[in-house]
Swiss-Prot record:
Top-level taxon: Eukaryota
Protein name per the record: Adenine phosphoribosyltransferase 1
Function of the molecule: Catalyzes a salvage reaction resulting in the formation of AMP, that is energically less costly than de novo synthesis.
Any GO molecular function: adenine phosphoribosyltransferase activity
Organism for this UniProt entry: Triticum aestivum
Length: 181
């Protein structure tokens, strides 16, 4: 990782909010990162530097905050951007993948044909916690025959062991955060 101060600037620009959205949670708020143009640029630059020579053809952003970081990365590396959304948000034909939550299940979707079998895909989200959403996104991509090159997140909550759920899928994160209040 770059030792030029960018990661430290990014980490210091992320606000931790205790007891949000419920008691006992320390919420990692990236909106303060977005308010700092240099930290925001550093974030996208670090991802671009990592992926510019990896022949990525698709950057898939996971709703909602993957939509913030994914498009500038896609533009900079010459890849298309594909949104992976919550159910019933995309018009037209979609494919979906269900995944488990702490209580119950949820689902994510993408347009049929948005990702092709020969595509090399980077999945982008703001944070990896339990790994459920990223795992579902990877399954969705792999179901159409494409290759997930890596999952890229700004923040990781290592205590929640999200990488374990992803198995041997490569994951790259900029900031390790503490989840305890």
């Amino acid at each position: 990782m770059a030792s030029d101060g960018r990661v430290e600037r990014i980490a210091s620009s992320i606000r931790a909010i205790p007891n949000f959205p419920k008691p006992g949670i320390l919420f990692q708020d990236i909106t303060t990162l977005l308010l700092d143009p240099q930290a925001f640029r550093d974030t996208t630059d670090l991802f671009v530097e990592r992926y510019k020579d990896k022949d990525i053809t698709v950057v898939a952003g996971v709703e909602a905050r993957g939509f913030i970081f994914g498009p500038p990365i896609a533009l900079a590396i010459g890849a298309k951007f594909v949104p992976i959304r919550k159910p019933k948000k995309l018009p037209g034909e979609v494919i979906s993948e269900e995944y488990s939550l702490e209580y119950g299940t949820d689902k994510i979707e993408m347009h049929v044909g948005a990702v092709q079998p020969n595509d090399r895909v980077l999945i982008v989200d703001d944070l990896i916690a339990t790994g459920g959403t990223l795992c579902a996104a990877a399954k969705l991509i792999e179901r159409v025959g494409a290759k997930v090159v890596e999952c890229a997140c700004v923040i990781e909550l290592p205590e929640l062991k999200g990488r374990d759920k992803l198995g041997d899928m490569p994951v790259f994160v900029l900031v390790q955060a503490d989840e305890s209040v």
